Amino acid sequence: MSVQLTPHFGNVQAHYDLSDDFFRLFLDPTQTYSCAYFERDDMTLQEAQIAKIDLALGKLNLEPGMTLLDIGCGWGATMRRAIEKYDVNVVGLTLSENQAGHVQKMFDQMDTPRSRRVLLEGWEKFDEPVDRIVSIGAFEHFGHQRYHHFFEVTHRTLPADGKMLLHTIVRPTFKEGREKGLTLTHELVHFTKFILAEIFPGGWLPSIPTVHEYAEKVGFRVTAVQSLQLHYARTLDMWATALEANKDQAIAIQSQTVYDRYMKYLTGCAKLFRQGYTDVDQFTLEK
């Protein structure tokens, strides 16, 4: 039976189309809105974000002239880096109008013979062959019911030697949680409800076995998994510190309510990563 899937435009735009100026108050200059990788302890946030992008792209065996699909491309930092470092063609997918506009301007200013496109659409509608796929911090938005379709689409899009790098926040299974001594507290339940209602509507965190199960079901092999758990705690700490330092501007751009909401989100999530209630992993998938 054919299933017609419509991308979650509303859920994504509710978060990412808040205001580019607001996000600039706490993100680094590349506007990378995902876990950084502090390869060295003395790295700035910007250096650590580029290190994370390099870590992801370095797992894809990119070669000049290949076409890289970036699913959930954000403000385009990964595609820019891929063009500059690996000399590839890029296609970015985003459901955010603000992000699509920002990326298009960036592309227009780049001096490269490589093709570069940003599409205001989801992976659900994408049907072009590409050589490699990267997806950083987008899988969390898809919802459990779409996992099978996501892996089907990405597997079909790639060639026989294709690779995908999937970077996503994950949660422990109940068994893993018990083994770690994690308990389900009222505080955790309330914070989770807050995140799903006010920050990432429609969001859902997979477990590591879930990613394996759905990826392998369509023919992918998961050849590597790398955790960046404490790197995300540090990233969130730095975002919260930057937002707090720009409190007056944040309130002027948005409101006291939005500022308070984001401080609660950033500090609360940092705590979850430190305690092990959440993790973030890079999965290398091969056909």
UniProtKB/Swiss-Prot annotation:
Regulation: Regulated by PknF. Inhibited by S-adenosyl-N-decyl-aminoethyl (SADAE), thiacetazone (TAC) and dioctylamine.
GO annotation terms (biological process): lipid biosynthetic process; methylation; mycolic acid biosynthetic process; S-adenosylmethionine metabolic process; symbiont-mediated evasion of host immune response; symbiont-mediated perturbation of host innate immune response
GO molecular function, a single term: cyclopropane-fatty-acyl-phospholipid synthase activity
Main enzyme class: transferase
Main location: cytoplasm
InterPro entries: CFA/CMAS, CMAS, CMAS_actinobact, SAM-dependent_MTases_sf
Subcellular location: Cytoplasm
Source organism, top-level taxon: Bacteria
UniProt record similarity statement: Belongs to the CFA/CMAS family.
UniProt subunit comment: Homodimer.
Protein name, per record: Cyclopropane mycolic acid synthase 3
Species, as recorded: Mycobacterium tuberculosis (strain ATCC 25618 / H37Rv)
